[in-house]
């Protein structure tokens, strides 16, 4: 893979920073009404590219493919609300965190059984494949269905096909602002 200095020189020589993100996780990275990629991670990565004197080029990918693409050299960086874990830190370099996410548990309004993470034992959730949300749900005894987007998760929850889901509190709040029903 080369040293960090070699990678930086290659990025600057190419004139572009290839940034991987999901593009489907509001408010972090998503498409607005005009189908323009926007969001907090988009703004952060634009600022990084500007500081490097290059243009950002975005590649949208499912969560479970982000690290594989980085490993294969298809991307220069992932800018997608990645939680720093001991296991990931063995392989990847991280910036100082630019955002902190609190994990929230969401259930249907008519669900009185699940109030805490401990109540997930024996229940079904849906979460992004290979995410820390998936790992957390499994650690509390939930059966987890792997999916690609928060939108899909909410649809499964609304249809009663899962009992609960875990995700960033800010993502749930943002979703509820856009979809108050």
Language model: regions and residue ranges:
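Short Pro/Gly-enriched coil loops immediately N-terminal to beta-strands
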Residues: 92-104, 149
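Extracytoplasmic small-molecule ligand-binding "clamshell" domains
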Residues: 2-81
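A ligand-binding cleft/hinge motif common to bilobed small-molecule-binding domains
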Residues: 65, 82-91, 136-139, 163-181
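Flexible hinge/capping segments at coil-to-helix
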Residues: 108-124
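Short helix-initiation/N-cap motifs at beta->coil->alpha
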Residues: 58-68, 112, 130-131, 145-159
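Short secondary-structure boundary segments
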Residues: 23, 82-83, 109, 129, ...
